């Protein structure tokens, strides 16, 4: 069985990102461009995104390691980023430029990766 390297990479990145949001939401907030310590509501939202991303990333990673179909998990990953983009667009004019670029730009890239992963053709594994 040949490993799905793209699913391994995408799953590992989303899983690690989610865990980092859970472990240190203040650092995640700064990394995404915030200039001050996040309040309790922002920390709750970072942790909620962390649970979501760790779950989706972990399940994408697990499917890749098992050699099972990863399309649905790629689609879930892209859907999570689409929700982030939609929410971000509602406050786009209130975000500093750094958050517009990193947060919304990252969501656009994530949507693209999710759609690519869900629709790509995979060669059947060679029999040995």
Describe the residue ranges of each PLM region.
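Short amphipathic, positively biased membrane-proximal segments
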Residues: 1-128
């Amino acid at each position: 069985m040949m490993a799905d390297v793209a699913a391994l990479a995408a799953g590992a990145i989303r899983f690690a990102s989610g865990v980092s949001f859970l472990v240190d939401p203040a650092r995640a907030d700064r990394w995404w461009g915030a200039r001050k310590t996040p309040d309790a509501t922002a920390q709750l939202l970072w942790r909620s995104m962390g649970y979501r991303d760790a779950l989706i990333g972990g399940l994408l990673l697990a499917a890749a390691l098992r050699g099972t179909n990863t399309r649905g998990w790629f689609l879930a990953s892209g859907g999570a980023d689409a929700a982030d983009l939609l929410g971000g667009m509602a406050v786009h004019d209130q975000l500093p430029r750094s958050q517009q670029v990193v947060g919304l730009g990252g969501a656009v890239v994530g949507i693209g990766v999710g759609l690519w992963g869900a629709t790509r053709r995979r060669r059947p594994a060679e029999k040995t």
